[in-house]
């Protein structure tokens, strides 16, 4: 899932034209003296600010990564006030940096999300915690989420949610102008699906997101999720002193998080009461059978504020990864019917005859084209286009020594669109993951991160995506909206469609 959502927007990437990415690493040889930050090329502060604030750069930070490589090479530096950021956009250098990490890697030292927790006296969850607290939470949650068999435990729960999604897509067809099979703004529908799925896993309860009438508090939560990423991007782009003069983004961010915490608290308290009631007089194994994730947190006797902080942040993280990736996947499959046909055949063979069969999590994970489609979509549209690190010691990146406590941004969008790694990098070609052509560098596409800071919900997200794609393509042929122009991505802290994706879901 979105393991570093709050920090991706610190990716201050700039510059002009966007040609090829295959810039030389500029190695000067092993006997050359290491170079300092002062030797790293980069834009002047006025150019950077103009690109960011006057030319719409905040919504196209991912494109500015590509342009930065073209102008400066794989490493460049930009300054914003007292903050200096080093950008790294070559897979070999990203690997070099990540393999120098300590036991508790730190990300950006400034986070408006963590500041909200401090001001509201809320506990940090896995997304906002740092240091020993982050390590403790990571160790606690890893066995519950990272192991493949742990994610597979929730397959039955997710299967029910997926079937409700199929029913909702049928209901949403033909609303408004256009063909009778057209569903407008599929990302909005998949937002509801993402929240329903992660809530079922976390809380063991259904929220009604996929019903004909969505509960008002659920609608408020969904709106807050979309809004908080916009306000995060604006807040992190502004120096702290400017927040007092332009309070709007910070105020919206706090209101959004307050809504999300209130929503989560309501459901956590309800589940806690139900667990306590059910556990009276029952053996422990009966209570825990098929239990939701929050139940295990109760069993660990985690303090109530910490449970609430983690559930709130995991609800947020579980929405965007699934909703955006599923939207892009069906968008690309609708524009590449030959791939969709091949994938439908693969899924049908696994399902067996009849459209109501349910493949196991293990069976889905063994479908090569299905896995390749998900990987290719995440290469083209990584949920988090850039990641950040703050090294706790001096490190070497290529020819440069990066001092400790320097903000470093890893430009994942740029490396995943590098033609030296991926021929025809802007084309949707799942076959590239099935042995077609040379294999890319393993750090060229890192949609879930790497190492101790990798996405905690990766297994769950992959399972949810595979199950949703399998059932949707079993029931529907997905076709593009007639006459629609191509949809491009934009940065909203995470990568999202710049406008609504409308698709036709034609019964098979």
Residue ranges and their predicted role:
Residues 2-17, 79-86, 149-160, 170-200, ...:
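Cytochrome P450
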Residues 122-124, 317, 435-465, 489-492:
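Cytochrome P450 heme-thiolate "Cys pocket" and heme-binding signature region
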Residues 28-56, 60-153, 157, 186, ...:
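Cytochrome P450 substrate-recognition site 1
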Residues 410-437:
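Conserved cytochrome P450 K-helix/beta-meander segment immediately N-terminal to the heme-binding cysteine loop
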Residues 194, 198, 203, 260-264, ...:
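Central I-helix of cytochrome P450 enzymes
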Residues 146-147, 231, 255-326, 356, ...:
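Conserved cytochrome P450 catalytic core segment spanning the I/J/K helices
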Residues 337-339, 441, 458-496:
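Cytochrome P450 heme-binding "Cys pocket" and the immediately downstream C-terminal segment
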Residues 51-73, 262, 266, 357-398, ...:
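Conserved cytochrome P450 K-helix E-x-x-R motif and the immediately C-terminal K′/meander segment
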């Amino acid at each position: 899932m979105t393991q570093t959502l709050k920090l991706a927007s610190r990716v201050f990437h700039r510059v002009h034209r966007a040609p090829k990415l295959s810039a030389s690493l500029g190695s000067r040889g092993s006997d050359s003296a290491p170079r300092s930050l002062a030797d790293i090329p980069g834009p002047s502060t006025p150019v950077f600010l103009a690109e960011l604030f006057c030319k719409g750069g905040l919504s196209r930070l991912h494109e500015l990564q590509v342009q930065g490589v073209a102008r400066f090479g794989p490493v460049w530096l930009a300054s914003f006030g007292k903050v200096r950021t080093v950008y790294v956009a070559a897979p070999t250098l990203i690997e070099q940096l990540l393999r120098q990490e300590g036991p508790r890697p730190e990300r950006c030292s400034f986070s408006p999300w963590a500041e909200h927790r401090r001001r509201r006296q809320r506990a940090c969850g896995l997304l906002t915690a740092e240091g020993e607290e982050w390590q403790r939470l990571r160790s606690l949650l890893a066995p519950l989420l990272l192991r493949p068999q742990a994610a597979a435990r929730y397959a039955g729960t997710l299967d029910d949610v997926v079937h409700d999604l199929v029913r909702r897509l049928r209901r949403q067809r033909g609303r408004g102008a256009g063909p009778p099979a057209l569903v407008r703004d599929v990302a909005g529908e998949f937002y509801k699906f993402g929240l329903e799925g992660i809530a079922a896993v976390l809380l063991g309860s259904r929220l009604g997101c996929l019903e004909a009438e969505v509960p008002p508090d659920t609608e408020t939560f969904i709106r807050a999720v979309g809004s908080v990423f916009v306000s995060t991007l604006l807040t992190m782009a502004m120096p702290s002193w400017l927040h007092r003069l332009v309070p709007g983004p910070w105020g919206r961010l706090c209101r959004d998080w307050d809504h999300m915490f209130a929503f989560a608290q309501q459901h956590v308290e309800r589940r806690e009461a139900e667990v306590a009631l059910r556990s009276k007089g029952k053996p422990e194994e009966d209570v825990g059978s098929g239990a939701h994730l929050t139940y295990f947190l109760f069993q660990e006797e985690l303090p109530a504020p910490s449970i609430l902080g983690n559930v709130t942040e995991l609800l947020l993280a579980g929405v965007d990864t699934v909703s955006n990736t599923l939207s892009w996947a069906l968008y690309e499959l609708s524009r590449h019917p030959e791939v969709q046909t091949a994938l439908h055949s693969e899924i049908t063979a696994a399902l067996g005859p009849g459209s109501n069969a349910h493949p196991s999590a293990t069976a889905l994970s063994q479908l090569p084209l299905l896995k390749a489609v998900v990987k290719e979509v995440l290469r083209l549209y990584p949920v988090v286009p850039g990641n950040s690190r703050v090294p706790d010691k001096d490190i070497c990146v290529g020819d440069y020594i990066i001092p400790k406590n320097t903000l470093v941004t890893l430009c994942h969008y740029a490396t995943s669109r590098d033609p030296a790694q991926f021929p025809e990098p802007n084309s949707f070609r799942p076959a590239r993951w099935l042995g077609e052509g040379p294999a890319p560098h393993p750090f060229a596409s890192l949609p879930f991160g790497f190492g101790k800071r990798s996405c905690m919900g990766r297994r769950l997200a992959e399972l949810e995506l595979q199950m949703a794609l399998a059932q949707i393509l079993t029931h529907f042929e997905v076709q593009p909206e007639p006459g629609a122009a191509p949809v491009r991505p934009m940065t909203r802290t995470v990568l999202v469609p710049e406008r609504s994706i409308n698709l036709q879901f034609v019964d098979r």
